[in-house]
């Protein structure tokens, strides 16, 4: 977990032999690899093992997944994708963006929407509240899609 990152990071790094054996024995269609990220909020600075990731991506015959991508930084994440990661999990970053967008909408005094859909934060209904949070999620996801070169791709 992120809180113990500095103490536990190296012990759990993926070993090529174990990864190959696991993929062969289980028949999984993708593999989450440990290359220096951690779930949750980091205590300390994340240090990804790009050499290990490069080696794994060349040898492991299934797409690689990066868990704990939140808080890793755009530069590290973009490099991880260029080095072989094909799926990045970013729940904390996306959730926080949604919560922050909702906080901002509720604290705002602006009129939102237009015509019959016009509302102020004090008169937001449930759907409008949800929409404010979803807008934050969407903006964060769009950021990552552009960062990873996934924009306008299916």
Regions found by a protein language model. Give the residues of each.
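Alpha/beta enzyme core
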Residues: 1-62, 74-83, 90, 97, ...
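Structural detector of well-ordered beta-strand residues that form the stable sheet scaffold
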Residues: 65-67
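C-terminal alpha-helical cap/extension of soluble enzyme domains
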Residues: 76-154
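Short, surface-exposed acidic/glycine-rich loop or hinge patches that mediate macromolecular interfaces
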Residues: 70-71, 93
């Amino acid at each position: 977990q992120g809180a113990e990152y500095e103490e536990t990071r190296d012990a759990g790094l993926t070993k090529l032999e174990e990864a190959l054996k696991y993929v062969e024995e289980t028949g999984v269609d993708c593999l989450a690899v440990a290359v220096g990220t951690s779930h949750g909020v980091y205590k300390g600075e994340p240090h990804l093992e790009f050499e290990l990731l490069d080696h794994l991506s060349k040898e492991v015959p299934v797409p690689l997944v990066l868990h704990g991508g939140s808080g890793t930084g755009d530069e590290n994440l973009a490099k991880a994708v260029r080095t072989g990661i094909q799926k990045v999990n970013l729940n904390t970053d996306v959730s926080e963006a949604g919560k922050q967008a909702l906080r901002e909408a509720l604290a705002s005094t602006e009129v939102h929407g237009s015509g019959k859909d016009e509302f102020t934060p004090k008169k937001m209904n449930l759907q409008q509240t949800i929409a404010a949070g979803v807008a934050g999620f969407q903006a964060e996801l769009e950021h990552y899609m552009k960062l990873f070169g996934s924009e306008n791709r299916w």
